[in-house]
């Protein structure tokens, strides 16, 4: 008897197939773990793909030292509870130079602490394939990127030189020094992610749920005061508002949204009504025209 899969089951099956394909074709894969909701779903899929064995690859977190404290606590707790092999990499040169989003601006900070940090880790451990949680509905440059995204020996992405992907057939051939970035969630939407998290009861960082938090209004965004390093500008005052985050990154560059959605059903209901992209809350996407595509060409995920 033929079984009809639901929409989420089809997405799950596709993602698991992609994850298994990478393990079968590459010598040294790694999964990027940014601690966000997409990473949570991707890790859950990887655990399903190889159960009862653990995923046969490590997780890599590029720590900029400016992540929300709740994110780091959640990362360490998940690593301890799940027992996965976690690599944490920090660009020490950037730390020694005192690079920060406040003094150097979002573009330079992102390039040094995120892009260069990622490239350092990929080179150090000689990973030839790296999973990422990017989705095509997030942003226009990601919308046109392949699921198996080729990178040169310098980790650069050329959007004009992408490989055809017919049905579920993927070209995994690379030369020495080259690599592939793989996006198992490419065809998922933000709503799909939230529905799957609810269905599978996947743990996520508490910042995704609405709560009263200290924020300042800066450049049209609500920036959470996460630690003492956030200095108030003239005229700014700390306000306590019920907010949550649709996307998580470095706290000085991530805007919150006013919300009362403190449960998964409420978040899903909110998603059904929203008409804006979650990436609007990320300052690094707006620091110059075509910002994300330029970052990806330079090696950003």
Swiss-Prot record:
Keyword terms, alphabetized: ATP-binding, Nucleotide-binding, Nucleotidyltransferase, Transferase
InterPro entries: PAPS_reduct_dom, Rossmann-like_a/b/a_fold, SO4_adenylTrfase_ssu, Sulfate_adenylyltrnsfr_sub2
Listed EC numbers: 2.7.7.4
Listed GO MF terms: ATP binding; sulfate adenylyltransferase (ATP) activity
Any GO BP annotation: hydrogen sulfide biosynthetic process
Known pathway: Sulfur metabolism; hydrogen sulfide biosynthesis; sulfite from sulfate: step 1/3
Reactions listed under catalytic activity: sulfate + ATP + H(+) = adenosine 5'-phosphosulfate + diphosphate
Signal peptide: none
NCBIfam families: CysD, PRK05253.1, PRK12563.1
Function, in words: With CysN forms the ATP sulfurylase (ATPS) that catalyzes the adenylation of sulfate producing adenosine 5'-phosphosulfate (APS) and diphosphate, the first enzymatic step in sulfur assimilation pathway. APS synthesis involves the formation of a high-energy phosphoric-sulfuric acid anhydride bond driven by GTP hydrolysis by CysN coupled to ATP hydrolysis by CysD.
Subunit-structure text: Heterodimer composed of CysD, the smaller subunit, and CysN.
UniProt similarity note: Belongs to the PAPS reductase family. CysD subfamily.
Protein name (database record): Sulfate adenylyltransferase subunit 2
Highest classification ranks of the organism: Bacteria, Pseudomonadati, Thermodesulfobacteriota, Desulfuromonadia, Geobacterales
